Swiss-Prot record:
Pathway annotation from the record: Secondary metabolite biosynthesis; terpenoid biosynthesis; Isoprenoid biosynthesis
Main location: plastid
FT transit peptide: 1-51
Gene name of the record: GFDPS
Keyword Transferase: yes
NCBIfam families: FPPsyn
Binding residue positions for Mg(2+) 1: D150, D156
GO CC annotations, alphabetized: chloroplast
GO BP, sorted A to Z: response to herbivore; response to insect; response to jasmonic acid; response to salicylic acid; terpenoid biosynthetic process
Cofactor annotation comment: Binds 2 Mg(2+) ions per subunit.
Source organism phylogeny: Eukaryota, Viridiplantae, Streptophyta, Embryophyta, Tracheophyta
EC primary class: transferase
InterPro entries for this protein: Isoprenoid_synthase_dom_sf (IPR008949), Polyprenyl_synt (IPR000092), Polyprenyl_synt_CS (IPR033749), Prenyl_diphosphate_synthase (IPR053378)
UniProt: Mg(2+) 2 binding residues: D150, D156
Name assigned to this protein: Geranylfarnesyl diphosphate synthase, chloroplastic
Amino acid sequence: MSHCTIFLYKYFPGKPRYQHCSFLHPLNHKLKSLFLPITGSRFLSNSTFSVSDSAHSHQAKPHVRNAQFDFKAYMLEKITAVNQALDAALPVREPVKIHEAMRYSLLLGGKRICPIVCLAACHLVGGDESTAMPSAAALEMIHAMSLMHDDLPCMDNDDLRRGRPSNHVVFGEGATVLAGYALIARAFEHIATATQGVGPGKILRVIGELAQLIGAEGVVGGQVVDLRCGGEGQMAIGLEQLEYIHLHKTAASVEASAVAGAVLGGASEEEIERLRKYSRSAGLLFQVVDDILDVTKSSEELGKTAGKDLAAGKTTYPKLLGMEKSREMAEKLKREAQEQLLGFDPIKAAPLIALVDFIAYRDK
């Protein structure tokens, strides 16, 4: 048994199965994820596509009508709303330096996938998105913190994030660590004080979900195993350990986002569980695609340092499985995520269906 294995436990029952499936192919109307800071976001045009085309036809036909969904317009609307909420939730105040460091990473742009999943899940189960917006903003604060700390020299040591210098390059390592702590505190404060329209029980459940996301059974647990396994001079890892790392570092964030939105929207426990499964598959899909892009795109195209994990000797999906198998795995995860949405209102499910396609076929 390797030193990595002793840290592992199953994140959810049953051993995941990755079978062969069709080769990853581009959408007829794909979106490029060209996201800029809060001053604006831009997409390619022609991003309206049929909801029924976004899942495999033999699974989607009984459920999804051939309705046109304008994903470009949806994303622009939600990103704008989230950016405005973040700006309002974290104004510059004393001490100015720490607030500037917090805002630098929080408002630096990005895909805003976690807050959008939160809002979409709330809407899917019949809730009011305004109820979920404080939690959506809090999730992005937590995500920003994780990226700030992930880039530190003692962690993954990256000087570039979203096409700009990483937080510690601009503000120094000490300020970055403290700004990350402050973002966590602000996230929970914001949920507790700004959430309206639901009872305290639901708010407490959301706070519990986000606390678990951050802790030893979430992002921290994944990062600990990541630091101990697969790097230069470390033990080699297999698919099970690699999956553990990314279920915790990446998929856990998407899962907490979906569950928070669903809880605030009044979902049943059965609906919450399906959205958990959706988000685990979508989160792993994001990481598999990220690893593929890391070896097929330049740093300029990605907005972060390309090929750094491979250069450091870390294990990635293409390194472990090869490019072809990694693409097959991505296609299967995409299908598994979308299958969890069968049975929901197809019109309300359209954003989450389209989001999985976007994750799968993005180019940065």
